[in-house]
Amino acid sequence: MTSIGSQAERFQGNDRVLFGIILGVITFWLFAQTTLNIAPDMGRDLGLGASTMNTAVAITALFSGIFIVVIGGLADRVGRVRIVRIGFYLSIVGSLLVGVAPVGRWASSFLLTGRALQGLSGACIMPASLALVKTYWDGAARQRAVSLWSIGSWGGSGVSALFGGLVTQSLGWRYIFFASIVVALLGLMLMRGTPESRASNQATYHFDFAGVITFMVAMVALQIVVTQGNKLGWTSLPVLALTAVALVTGALFFRIEARTSAAFVDFSLFSNSTYTGATLSNFLLNAVTGTMIVSLELVQLGGKMTAKQAGMLTLGYAVAIISFIRVGEKLLQRFGPRKPMVWGCLITGLAILLLSPANLLLTDYRILAIIGYTLYGTGLAFYATPSTDAALSNLPEGQAGAGSGIYKMASSLGAAFGVAISAAIFTAISSGTDSARWMEGVITFYGRQDNLAVRTAAMIALMFNVFMVAVAILSIMLTIPRGKKSQ
């Protein structure tokens, strides 16, 4: 204990360790997230149906979101470097299972197990690596480290659709996951020699089994309701039963966490308004990831574009978020977190509005989409570092892992439920033959008239995302203080 503590006190974070951490982050946000774009190719090659592939896509974010706080708290006690390494090992095994998934009856077992392990990998790497950034970097160096860490997460997510499509077309989708193994091994090598870091208060650790189980059941039930409600029927017995399960177990979860001293979600962290605002707005800004699935489905189903052509529209998003994420850091240093977070949300909202006019001709819409996706990346870049720094800098030292775990849980669950809800709205409206009639005389639709249901569905689903941006702005203005934090 003493040797570990003295080594950690003397150690200063360097670029070798930081690059190793970033490689771990992109194994989840870049490589694992490519399934959002390549799922049809994977399903076709493996002989799996759409429902199985939808589960395979969703299970990674779901497992990450469910376990990220538990593992973040565990990292504070057993060692953050150790948990990051475990995350690398899980990523390697998970990617290997997906990459070698056989055709036939074992395909779904290999695929779903591998995707679940990738989610657990993200749950290990994200909170523990953020806690290491908080521990081994300070001041401006920490803000730079957070910016580069954010490039791995936000930037990796932005590039994933384009990257997945290009690799699948050139080499085949399996090579995405083989490459992920190589990246994970390199990350492990770069982090060799990093001293262990633990919370200073080494109290006896008690696993919050009841809290974890009730939270997991509530989240899984809610996810099934959102994703399958339209197919099963919103008033069907299974959907109503699952809704009841989600409500009951959710209430039990809050009751258990409020009464136990070993709660895996420490609600006392939310007594700090800055941390609360950063986490809530982070959930909402990740939830507008639903914008991408709706707008890309719109141009493919309504405009008959190919997946590759649709993916190329997002190129500006990837370039902007990587190019401007350091700008968010500079804005943070000059103005504090509040202004750049609000500016980022406003730009993101404008981007979604530009993606919304599905009544235009496809040639006109493509121009707006290119501009919109570029602004989308710019807005998220402005927001990312100020929000992450606001959350990290307001965490007590002994709760760095658990607190950063809650913050990143907001990312995973926000994206999971944002995509699910947006897709559910889009699917429900676009599948109805008479769904567009109520807009006749209100909005003029140019060009083809056989796709009005799809175009109407996209406009309504995208307006839902604009609403979430508005709520994010409100939460920031109510919770994040003006100006820079005093040093």
Task: Report the location of each language-model feature.
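Cytosolic juxtamembrane N-terminal segment immediately preceding the first transmembrane helix
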Residues: M1-L30, R44
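12-transmembrane solute porter fold
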Residues: L18-F28, T35-N37, L237-L242, T249, ...
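Extracellular/periplasmic helix-loop-helix junction of adjacent transmembrane segments
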Residues: I38-F67, W106-L112, K308-M312
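Small-residue (Gly/Pro/Ala) motifs that create kinks and tight helix-helix packing interfaces
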Residues: A39, G156-T168, L222, V226, ...
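Membrane-interface helix termini in secondary transporters
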Residues: D41, G72-G73, R77, L166, ...
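Central cavity-lining transmembrane alpha-helices of secondary-active solute carriers
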Residues: A58-G73, M126-L130, L315-G328
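Helix-loop-helix hairpins in multi-pass membrane proteins, especially solute transporters
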Residues: D76-A210
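Hydrophobic transmembrane-helix bundles of small-molecule transporters
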Residues: Q169-N282, V288, L313, V466
